UniProtKB/Swiss-Prot annotation:
Pfam family, one: RuvB_N
Domain of life: Bacteria
Reaction(s) the record says it catalyses: ATP + H2O = ADP + phosphate + H(+)
Protein known as: Holliday junction branch migration complex subunit RuvB
Record has DNA damage as a keyword: yes
Residues annotated as binding ATP: L26, R27, G68, K71, T72, T73, E134, D135, F136, R177, Y187, R224
InterPro entries cross-referenced by the UniProt entry: AAA+_ATPase, AAA_lid_4, DNA_helicase_Holl-junc_RuvB, P-loop_NTPase, RuvB-like_N, RuvB_C, WH-like_DNA-bd_sf, WH_DNA-bd_sf
Organism: Lactobacillus gasseri (strain ATCC 33323 / DSM 20243 / BCRC 14619 / CIP 102991 / JCM 1131 / KCTC 3163 / NCIMB 11718 / NCTC 13722 / AM63)
Segments for region (Head domain (RuvB-H)): 261-339
Assembly information from the UniProt record: Homohexamer. Forms an RuvA(8)-RuvB(12)-Holliday junction (HJ) complex. HJ DNA is sandwiched between 2 RuvA tetramers; dsDNA enters through RuvA and exits via RuvB. An RuvB hexamer assembles on each DNA strand where it exits the tetramer. Each RuvB hexamer is contacted by two RuvA subunits (via domain III) on 2 adjacent RuvB subunits; this complex drives branch migration. In the full resolvosome a probable DNA-RuvA(4)-RuvB(12)-RuvC(2) complex forms which resolves the HJ.
Length: 339
């Protein structure tokens, strides 16, 4: 069976090299410039102001939520608001405890260490963080054989900002050491429209207001998807010679890209059709779904499910996942018969 993810998804929220380049050019510098996530922003504004008044490092921050919602961007904004440097890495990149020790030893007082995908830290690496986060020291084992001994190394007060799409996979000892925990939510259409309008200025292109709204509606509540779709729709508009991206061109180009009015792409539709046609709409176990689409269960839960759940196309039950009436109607199937 062909893997549903053989081709990169235009609406996939996972980052690629082009996204990282785009996001760097669009990155706001201050909380006031950061669009959306109002609850998170208002709370962080207070925490940052209090830390600066006390002349202390900001408490450790955990940002969690689906991919593409601006966790990395917010980490950079927080560091900028605090007036400190940020050192960025990721869980998979820190392969051994010594790698983390090297990063920590380079920090100055108040600096931010940002670890993306923090749930993927190896256990020995994570354990080094415990004393570093709580008491700002690490113990380094030096020597060999009978001369082996631990050296107590103090660290300057610093802020760890961790980002994760899988908060439930964090161990309790690590999670409990974060004083600030913020849940990043999907963006509203209004906020996405503002992001699209702002991005269009950076991209040196114009977009009609109704076209921006249509693009926002199909962007899956995710700024990364909105910016990616804006770039593709801009290509269509430029080839047509439009001075500003029109609603008609937006609808036409998204139709060709197979992104429907709910933001579903062919991958979403394949997954939902598989559940409907092969399993009567469910419930279907997560392992069965993963086997049918050629992915592992983590990818299903982290990449495919969040938006489908949030939009009400599937439900999660103790017996597995079920397709909703809304999904049947969206895909053109007769209404699901009541059991």
């Amino acid at each position: 069976m062909k893997d549903v993810n053989d081709e990169e998804r235009i609406i996939g929220a996972e980052s690629n090299e082009e996204d990282e380049t785009i996001e760097l050019s669009l990155r706001p510098q201050l909380l006031a410039q950061y669009i959306g996530q109002d609850k998170v922003k208002s709370e962080m504004k207070i925490y940052i102001k209090a830390a600066k008044q006390r002349d202390e490092a900001l408490d450790h921050v955990l940002l969690y939520g689906p991919p593409g919602l601006g966790k990395t961007t917010l980490a950079f904004v927080i560091a900028n608001e605090m007036g400190v440097h940020l050192k960025s890495t990721s869980g998979p990149a820190i392969e051994k405890a010594g790698d983390l020790v090297a990063l920590l030893s380079e920090l100055n007082p108040g600096d931010v260490l940002f670890i993306d995908e923090i749930h993927r830290l190896a256990k020995p690496v994570e354990e080094v963080l415990y004393s570093a986060m709580e008491d700002f020291y690490i113990d380094i084992v030096v020597g060999e054989g009978q001369t082996t001994h631990a050296v107590h190394v103090p660290l300057p007060p610093f802020t760890l900002i961790g980002a994760t799409t899988r908060a439930g996979q964090l161990s309790a000892p690590l999670r409990d050491r974060f004083g600030i925990i913020e849940h990043m939510q999907y963006y509203s259409i209004d906020d996405l429209e503002k992001i699209i309008q702002r991005s269009s200025v950076v991209f040196n292109t114009k977009i009609d207001p109704e076209a921006a709204i249509e693009l926002a509606r199909r962007s899956r509540g995710t700024p990364r998807v909105a910016n990616r779709l804006l770039k593709r729709v801009r290509d269509f508009a430029e080839v047509k010679g439009e001075e500003a991206i029109s609603l008609a061109t937006t609808k036409h180009s998204l139709h060709l890209l197979e992104v429907d009015d709910e933001g579903l792409d062919q991958t979403d539709r394949k997954l939902l059709r598989m559940m409907i046609e092969n399993y009567g709409g469910g419930p279907v176990g997560i392992k069965t779904i993963a086997a049918n689409v050629g992915e592992d269960t983590d990818t299903i839960e982290e990449v495919y499910e969040p938006y489908l759940l949030q939009k009400g196309f599937i439900t999660r039950t103790p017996r597995g996942r079920s397709v909703t009436q809304k999904a049947y109607l969206q895909l053109g199937y007769p209404p699901k018969k009541a059991e």
